[in-house]
Amino acid sequence: MESIAAATFTPSRLAARPATPAAAAAPVRARAAVAAGGRRRTSRRGGVRCSAGKPEASAVINGSAAARAAEEDRRRFFEAAERGSGKGNLVPMWECIVSDHLTPVLAYRCLVPEDNMETPSFLFESVEQGPEGTTNVGRYSMVGAHPVMEVVAKEHKVTIMDHEKGKVTEQVVDDPMQIPRSMMEGWHPQQIDQLPDSFTGGWVGFFSYDTVRYVEKKKLPFSGAPQDDRNLPDVHLGLYDDVLVFDNVEKKVYVIHWVNLDRHATTEDAFQDGKSRLNLLLSKVHNSNVPKLSPGFVKLHTRQFGTPLNKSTMTSDEYKNAVMQAKEHIMAGDIFQIVLSQRFERRTYANPFEVYRALRIVNPSPYMAYVQARGCVLVASSPEILTRVRKGKIINRPLAGTVRRGKTEKEDEMQEQQLLSDEKQCAEHIMLVDLGRNDVGKVSKPGSVKVEKLMNIERYSHVMHISSTVSGELDDHLQSWDALRAALPVGTVSGAPKVKAMELIDELEVTRRGPYSGGLGGISFDGDMLIALALRTIVFSTAPSHNTMYSYKDTERRREWVAHLQAGAGIVADSSPDDEQRECENKAAALARAIDLAESAFVDKE
């Protein structure tokens, strides 16, 4: 197997994180965390300054006031550093600016140029379900680029890149997830009220479906996995200490830099370096030469399904045969249910970020994500969380049972009743709720697991699903990483019993799933975790070991990308092979609609 380090992480590529200038362009008032203890994160605004202009302007409005504010920030920073002395403490510095001139998409382009498809970076957005099937933009959007550190695992080989030190190390370990976990055990981030109640910094990346092999080493070894034809990492995590958080309700942006005191000889050095880095981050979003985004033109009926995709890792007959084999195992009592997937391929001249911009229109979902990782770019519109841990509370939300949306409200209501009266889909959903209760129960305090919501209907742009919510209180001696290990992968993408179903998936599917049906999201410095299930996720491979760019439309601008769209269907005793094949095709075609729109909006007009 080709070395991951050699193929993707050569030392020359360590310069992903830009150097901090020796002196900042102008002094900017930086807020340092001062409140230790429990995180309340209320909306208290005392001390949070919002500036409409460039940061330089605010520094000269009132010289004496600015000087007093700067001195107060310095004092608070030193107090926070003193409390964290000897503990590897993390102290946030931030500035709050109004966002009426900036959007999350444009902010991402301010941090990552259009021609840079390799720098690890992310953009998280959300569309939440409102009453009567309405949708609302989620309150917070998050943007980050140039992680200070990366942890990348391929099977049991781990590459750790420290961009601050320019150092690459490699290890062979039993469980790569122990590496970021052990790093976090030495961190004690200062908790404050003024920062938003969202992800503000920490680990961001993805965990592939094959991550389960670190947990089930005997029954699901890597040696027994299907063919690995893309050579993608099994885990990629970037440590982001620079993050932009958009408050879409109050129309402001928190520009945040976390200072790691352990990286500095003195507190004064830490303060000055943090202020300089915050100024650098501010200068990017206040840049007078803000990148221009192509406006695009929406010419498609975005709620329609696209045309079927013809190229797949399995022919139609091969997939139907796999369904029949799975049914034989069900009839024999080996399993109750199994999810069999196949990977479709679509070539396009639209680049991944354009596809993401289109996906936001075609399929808005609670967990929208654009993630540039080592070896691939993920464009996701996930409706479902894999696991969430917030202040010790674990949430698992099985989403299973699907029907298309109607054209009118009356048709929607009819479809909803039809879905809830479908015995097959309801039985499948209850089975997955039981799996969710089992996953949460593994890491929860005795007696704390409960089903908060059972068989609710959630409406999305193209379909509606049956949804339930399972919760539990995380056991005192465990961490969010344990909750992730217990859940990954969830039953909605594997089957029941889970491990036996995955053993059969290894036999019946022809290629490794990679990011599909794994998870992507973030783990905050304080240990809170939100990992979305990697469904409705388009994977663009970028690793040099797997060339996905075959030809050029315009040698100056356009190259052809290969988009991988994977979809699966839940197989039970009375499943029809034809119906399950059609379900896979429909799911992939709905996702491919974003590529249709991206081509129509951004490519065809050139």
Curated annotation (Swiss-Prot):
Pfam families in UniProt: Anth_synt_I_N, Chorismate_bind
GO terms, molecular function: anthranilate synthase activity
EC number in record: 4.1.3.27
Keywords associated with the record: Amino-acid biosynthesis, Aromatic amino acid biosynthesis, Chloroplast, Lyase, Plastid, Transit peptide, Tryptophan biosynthesis
Residue range covered by the transit peptide: 1-49
Induction section of the entry: By chitin oligosaccharide elicitor and the phytopathogenic fungus Bipolaris oryzae.
Keyword Lyase found: yes
GO biological process, one term: L-tryptophan biosynthetic process
Highest taxon in the source lineage: Eukaryota
Compartments, record wording: Plastid, Chloroplast
Record entry for activity regulation: Feedback inhibition by tryptophan.
Catalytic activity line of the entry: chorismate + L-glutamine = anthranilate + pyruvate + L-glutamate + H(+)
Gene Ontology CC entries for this record: anthranilate synthase complex; chloroplast
Pathway the protein contributes to: Amino-acid biosynthesis; L-tryptophan biosynthesis; L-tryptophan from chorismate: step 1/5
Family statement: Belongs to the anthranilate synthase component I family.
Purpose: Part of a heterotetrameric complex that catalyzes the two-step biosynthesis of anthranilate, an intermediate in the biosynthesis of L-tryptophan. In the first step, the glutamine-binding beta subunit of anthranilate synthase (AS) provides the glutamine amidotransferase activity which generates ammonia as a substrate that, along with chorismate, is used in the second step, catalyzed by the large alpha subunit of AS to produce anthranilate.
Subunit structure: Heterotetramer consisting of two non-identical subunits: a beta subunit and a large alpha subunit.
Protein name per Swiss-Prot or TrEMBL: Anthranilate synthase alpha subunit 2, chloroplastic
Source organism per UniProt: Oryza sativa subsp. japonica
Upper taxonomic lineage: Eukaryota, Viridiplantae, Streptophyta, Embryophyta, Tracheophyta
